[in-house]
Amino acid sequence: MTNKKRRQRGSRTHGGGTHKNRRGAGHRGGRGAAGRAKHEFHNYGPLGKYGFKRPESAQTEVLEVTVQKLDEDAALYAADDLAEEDGDAYVIDARDVVEDGYEADVVKVLGGGQVRRELRVTADAFTAGAVELIEEAGGEATLSERAEEAADESENTSDDEDDEA
């Protein structure tokens, strides 16, 4: 027998107040958050700001497209003048074929699936798997001018930081 239970021996209500109190949930004002009139306040959520929000200038919007989708839809892109046919190869700029591609900061080509056509894809970023699939099919993955400029810029800033240190 637990100590508390032992102590309560001989007590009529075992610490529960009067004999009326431990009948159902009435003594507690209902179950859970019952009773919304000034009583459990369940309809008032937490207020105020909390957490951390990165500034808009620090956020980059990345749109993604898979190599398999580019491969499957290459003929459609060529028909819609979104891509060019160069012999057996399709020359595709990922920004042209992704919806809102020119509004995004980065358009990235992801690997996955199969590539049956020779593709020459230009994008801001590629995964290693995407580059591998494109090159296995005889195509090439080229970084866009925008991505190269950003890479040059980051190299310049890191060189400046090294000089200061």
Curated annotation (Swiss-Prot):
This protein's GO cellular component annotations are: cytosolic large ribosomal subunit
Biological role = Binds to the 23S rRNA.
Q: Which UniProt keywords apply?
A: Ribonucleoprotein, Ribosomal protein, RNA-binding, rRNA-binding
Q: Which organism is it from?
A: Halorubrum lacusprofundi (strain ATCC 49239 / DSM 5036 / JCM 8891 / ACAM 34)
Q: Where is this region: Disordered?
A: 1-39, 137-165
- Recite the lineage of the species: Archaea, Methanobacteriati, Methanobacteriota, Stenosarchaea group, Halobacteria
Q: Where is the composition biased (Basic residues)?
A: 1-30
Biological processes, Gene Ontology terms? translation
Gene Ontology MF terms in the entry: rRNA binding; structural constituent of ribosome
Subunit description? Part of the 50S ribosomal subunit.
A Pfam family annotated for this chain is Ribosomal_L27A
Quote the protein name from its UniProt record.
Large ribosomal subunit protein uL15
Record flagged with keyword Transmembrane: no
InterPro entries registered for this protein in UniProt: Rbsml_uL15_N, Ribosomal_uL15, Ribosomal_uL15/eL18, Ribosomal_uL15/eL18_sf, Ribosomal_uL15_CS
Q: Where is the composition biased (Acidic residues)?
A: 150-165
What the record says about family reads:
Belongs to the universal ribosomal protein uL15 family.
